[in-house]
Amino acid sequence: MGIPVLAPYHGELAAKSAKFGGFKVQAFDLPHDGVPNYGFFIRMPNGERFTYLTDMEMCVYNFRKQRLNHILIECNHIDENLDEEEAKYAHVVRGHASLRVVKDFLEANWTEDLQTVILCHANALEDTGRMLREVKETVGEDVAVWMAEKRAEYWLNNEKEGDK
């Protein structure tokens, strides 16, 4: 018996939800420069709610009523740091979320239930310290905010591996 895999590039997925053990997963469209892309709303076995948002220009959906506990979201660049003359400028702007987009999403979706924000897919040349500071200012001191690192594991209880 195989393991079913949810892949973000199958067009029929956007209209589907699935269960994996105690996890309930709902896929939704995310704009990514004309390429099919999906985010995921996940209800975990303990009832907590999680969104996965990456490779996107923005998220047009609002999850305030779902009272998110955990958010993994792309924070690729800071708008004013982009060079409009650079060859990749259009690709970056049309296909990836800026710090401003992330802060707008977090402001629109913040509730007192939010516990964790993990930023991912940052441009290697960006000021990730600034990204972390500004997101922390947006969501408040009670919310754990991390920049995803390669091979790191994160527990969704405000602790990162090694923080215990």
Region roles according to the model:
Residues 7, 27, 145-147:
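A structural preference for short, hydrophobic beta-strand core positions in alpha/beta folds
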Residues 61-151:
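Cap/insert and terminal regions of metallo-dependent hydrolase folds
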Residues 4-6, 51, 116-118:
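A structural signal for isolated positions on well-ordered beta-strands in alpha/beta enzyme cores
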Residues 1, 32, 121:
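Histidine-centered divalent metal-coordination motifs
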Residues 10-66, 70, 152-164:
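Core dinuclear metal-dependent hydrolase active-site scaffold
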